[in-house]
Regions:
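The feature captures the beta-strand-to-loop junction immediately N-terminal to the Walker
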Residues: 36-38
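Helix-to-loop junction immediately C-terminal to a conserved catalytic motif
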Residues: 51
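Conserved ABC transporter NBD signature motif
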Residues: 59-70, 78
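Conserved ABC ATPase signature
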Residues: 146-150, 154
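Hydrophobic anchor residue at the start of the ABC signature
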Residues: 160
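ABC ATPase C-loop
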Residues: 163-164
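Catalytic Walker B motif of ABC-type/P-loop ATPase nucleotide-binding domains
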Residues: 171-174
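Conserved beta-strand-loop-alpha-helix hinge in the C-terminal portion
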Residues: 223-246
């Protein structure tokens, strides 16, 4: 899915905050981008903007030619084609990890699928993919367990599987390595990068994570401060506004 922002500005007047300031950005279909920047730089706001969850004060937003702020039908099509991993997982307590993992596929369910899920199963067309993803991320034994009994790292991996399971055309990940140990963080990033031909934007403040991507877009105070394939020491210092930041 091709993404285009033209002069995108997002203001939160009640807080007196300009979260994004005239952002111009084009991401081609199938491209993988690390969105880098310190806390408060506008990374999460940009992801929410692409999903139609926050409205621009000015500027233009298009996702695969769709206007997230156009018709309800456009927004519905966009969200059905998108997979999202938020920094704070929104898993449903009281339900098993298995049911939480398949929830993103619910728009495709028929009556038999609903019955299958309500009795603890998985729609047949997703069962093998769920098994493969859960084994890959080391949580296959956790699937029957209610999510409130899982560790933070296990919950992160279930949220990641949920985003990957439908095979979305657009993947948005907001600090998806939070709470993961280094090997699990690398596995999570590579799983997102290996998703089937999906356009991927992953936000992070971690330079090591960002450098795993062929393109890095950095935000500082709501503006694009860097867009390219790699970072030098001067770039890092400009992004973070502090001299001597390790690159």
């Amino acid at each position: 899915m091709r993404l285009e922002l033209a002069g995108a500005t997002v203001d939160f007047p009640a807080q007196g905050v300009r979260a994004l300031a005239g952002v111009d950005l084009v991401v081609e279909e199938g491209e993988q981008v690390a969105l880098l920047g310190p806390s408060g730089s506008g990374k999460t706001t940009l992801l929410r903007l692409l999903l139609g969850a926050v409205r621009p004060s000015s500027g233009r937003v298009r996702v695969a030619g769709l206007d997230p702020f156009g018709t309800p039908q456009e927004l519905h099509r966009l969200r059905r084609a998108s997979g999202v991993v938020w920094q704070r997982d929104d898993l449903v307590p009281g339900l098993s990890a298995r049911i939480n993992a398949v929830m993103a596929t619910a728009p495709t369910w028929g009556p038999r699928d609903w019955l299958m899920v309500l009795t603890g199963g998985v729609p047949a067309r997703y069962a093998e993919r769920l098994r493969a993803l859960s084994r890959c991320h080391g949580v296959d034994a956790c699937l029957p367990t209610r999510v409130e009994r899982l560790s933070g790292g296990q919950r992160r991996r279930i949220a990641l599987i949920r985003a990957l399971l439908p095979g979305p055309g657009l993947l948005l990940a907001d600090e998806p390595t939070t709470g993961l140990d280094p090997p699990a963080a690398v596995a999570a990033v590579e799983a997102l990068r290996c998703a089937d031909a999906a356009t991927l934007i992953l936000s992070t403040h971690d330079l090591g994570v960002a450098r795993r991507f062929p393109r890095i877009v950095a935000l500082r105070k709501g503006r694009v401060s860097f867009d390219g394939p790699g970072l030098c020491q001067q770039d890092v210092e400009r992004i973070y506004g502090v001299a001597g930041v390790a690159s």
